Amino acid sequence: MEELSQALASSFSVSQDLNSTAAPHPRLSQYKSKYSSLEQSERRRRLLELQKSKRLDYVNHARRLAEDDWTGMESEEENKKDDEEMDIDTVKKLPKHYANQLMLSEWLIDVPSDLGQEWIVVVCPVGKRALIVASRGSTSAYTKSGYCVNRFSSLLPGGNRRNSTAKDYTILDCIYNEVNQTYYVLDVMCWRGHPFYDCQTDFRFYWMHSKLPEEEGLGEKTKLNPFKFVGLKNFPCTPESLCDVLSMDFPFEVDGLLFYHKQTHYSPGSTPLVGWLRPYMVSDVLGVAVPAGPLTTKPDYAGHQLQQIMEHKKSQKEGMKEKLTHKASENGHYELEHLSTPKLKGSSHSPDHPGCLMEN
């Protein structure tokens, strides 16, 4: 590990000119062509083809999540244990059924050629990802690792005793912002017992923004609804639209941008069909002229963050994923598959280096 740290340290230049945050990252174009372009674009193409033939039983999957009923699943898991190369202690500590249910992003390194036509962007607040399950008169919030961190009543269908029936259950992908006591709704996987996993992104978003306002009082904080539920808006990914978005004022502290392919289904786990960028990266990565403002101002760690992304991606290509993932978990430098901002350990600029806000 000591040798690895030295090797990584030696690959970072501390020259003020070379790593100036006012200029594009010096190795960005080289990295994009060599390590990510074919890989990420090819994986996108294959996943879009695969989902046409892949039809999972999401009706039962949603019902199991809503009712916490996993009868018959234990025998299947027992058969898989011999094939899993995981540490036994880790398996015991992690929850089984509610873990890894969220669709997570990758850094958007390879710019899609159809970005303006086939992609949608969502501006995300600072917060933590949460799987929300409203069923049987109660609402539960789970982390991406499957831990239940809160149970409360809500005005979501199935979320409180007044509006709960056996078929009324709802499953949402949210970002919880503690400052505003709000669950910002990213996506919908199930609404009133109807699963939407196999629906395209543009339809899921349309449904979400049509149905959320119909639930009176859902966006207000009350005794029956102690946390607000607010749908996050989505925008086209044309250069003009991105410029408009980056000029807007939002009622929350912005963490970053999620880019969704319009045709992608909701698939739990990390996918190249959902990309993630910090707002200041848009000009360098997408080549879009952006307006000057709070969202596009590059922080002091901008050059270092791009360097971390590229080194991590390169290491995966060279078969060093396991070592660097362990290194990342120790130093908190990487949260590449989740929405976050890296914090440089021991940095003297701690106020300017927010921690991993989206997911710790």
Curated annotation (Swiss-Prot):
Compartments, record wording: Nucleus; Cytoplasm
Keywords: Acetylation, Cytoplasm, Disease variant, Limb-girdle muscular dystrophy, Nucleus, Phosphoprotein, RNA-binding, Transport
Stretch list, region Necessary for interaction with KPNB1 and m3G-cap U1 and U5 snRNP import receptor activity: 1-65
The keyword Chaperone is annotated on this UniProt entry: no
Domain IBB: 11-73
Any GO MF annotation of the entry: nuclear import signal receptor activity
Bias (Polar residues) ranges: 7-22
Connected disease: Muscular dystrophy, limb-girdle, autosomal recessive 29: An autosomal recessive form of limb girdle muscular dystrophy, a group of genetically heterogeneous muscular disorders that share proximal muscle weakness as the major attribute. Most limb girdle muscular dystrophies present with elevated creatinine kinase and myopathic electromyographic features. Disease is usually progressive to a variable degree, ranging from minor disability to complete inability to ambulate, and can involve the large proximal muscles, as well as axial and facial muscles.
Functional note: Functions as an U snRNP-specific nuclear import adapter. Involved in the trimethylguanosine (m3G)-cap-dependent nuclear import of U snRNPs. Binds specifically to the terminal m3G-cap U snRNAs.
Protein name, per record: Snurportin-1
